[in-house]
Each structure stands twice: as C-alpha cells, then as structure tokens.
Amino acid sequence: MATAWAPDAGRTSWLLEVGPGLLGIAVAAAVHRRLPLSHWVHVCIFLHLLILIYGGYYTYALTPLGNWAKDAFGFARNHYDRIGHLALGVFPAFVIREVLLKKTALARDGWLYFLVLCVVLAVAAFWELLEWWVTLLVAGDVGQAFLGSQGDVWDAQWDMLLALLGAALVLPLFARAHDRSMARVPRRG
C-alpha cells in the first residue's frame, strides 16, 4: 500500500493497475469462511499482486526492469506488460482451478484443464476490453498508460495469448503440488 502514497505513474493510474488485485484480496477474505483457499493459492495471489504493484507504480510501459531488458536485449518495447499478462494466466489459473474443484463435481481430468483455460482466456479478454474502456473514459496520458500498447497494433491479441499460454504451461507442471496444498485445507460449503 505504501506504493500508493506517491507512485511515479500517479494515483489514478496506480489504482487502475493495482485495484483489481486489491479487489481480489477483498473477495478472498470475504469468502474465506465458506471457501478457505489453499496456501498455494494464497502464494499465487501474493505473487500476482507484487507484479501488479510494481507495474502500477511505474506503469507497465515504464518499469525499470522492463527498460533494463529492453536496453540489454535490444527490444523495441518494454516487455514488462507481457510479463504482467503472462502472470494473468499463471496465477489466477490456480484460483480458478481450486474454486472449480471445490464448488463443482468436476474430476481432475481434461475437462477441468479445458475449463480453467477457458475462464483464464475470458478473464484476459475482459481485461483487454477494460483497458479499451478506460482509454476511452479516462483523460489522455492516464488512459494511454493503462492501455499500454506501446504502438503495437496486436497488443491485445498478444496479451490474451500470453495469459492462455501461461495457464496452459503451469497447470500440468504444478497441478499435483496444488492438489497436495488443497488436501491440507478442510473442505467447507
């Protein structure tokens, strides 16, 4: 929260970037008694929030880490935005997976994997629509900074693809670890 005091990007931009993560924490806290989440998911939420806070402090297009990579590897743009969208697939995938396993009769099979990927892609697409709406509604630089396309006409498509790939890659690799973490949480509701 200290990054909200005087973010380089300005408070409005910071709130737009970090607000959804803070809302996610509020929702997780509100439903904790009915739907206790695993330690794995809490770590995912924390790591995702760190990425959001860092990007929100500077704006994703101006993060020092992204600028360093841009200079070091000769990239045409700051790719921290891409890291953020990859994270939009990686970390929420486990939240979605856990909720589906706890609140539905889905088995741990291909349908679960497919549905988690569908929800991740839907969230990524909604985020792209949200970026567009904010650009239309919020004045000048803040709206453009939130959009973060950096002149790439395919930015929205890349962002959605990266979220989908992030989820598609981590789910098979870490599903068993996630299952072990869920097994240590009593099932309620």
Task: Cite the ranges covered by each PLM segment.
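Membrane-interfacial alpha-helical segments at the cytosolic side of multi-pass membrane proteins
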Residues: 23-32, 87-104, 136-142, 161-177
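"…centered on the first transmembrane helix and the immediately adjacent amphipathic helix/loop
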Residues: 1-90, 94
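Interfacial helix-loop-helix junctions of multi-pass membrane proteins
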Residues: 7-14, 62-66, 80, 124-168
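Short, intrinsically disordered terminal tails adjacent to the first/last structured region
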Residues: 187-189
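Lipid-exposed faces of alpha-helical membrane segments in multi-pass integral membrane proteins
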Residues: 2, 19-26, 43-54, 118, ...
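Short hydrophobic/aromatic segments of transmembrane alpha-helices and their interfaces
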Residues: 2-4, 71-72, 112-115, 128, ...
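Internal alpha-helical transmembrane segments of multi-pass membrane proteins
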Residues: 104-121
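Membrane-interface capping segments at transmembrane-helix boundaries
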Residues: 175-185
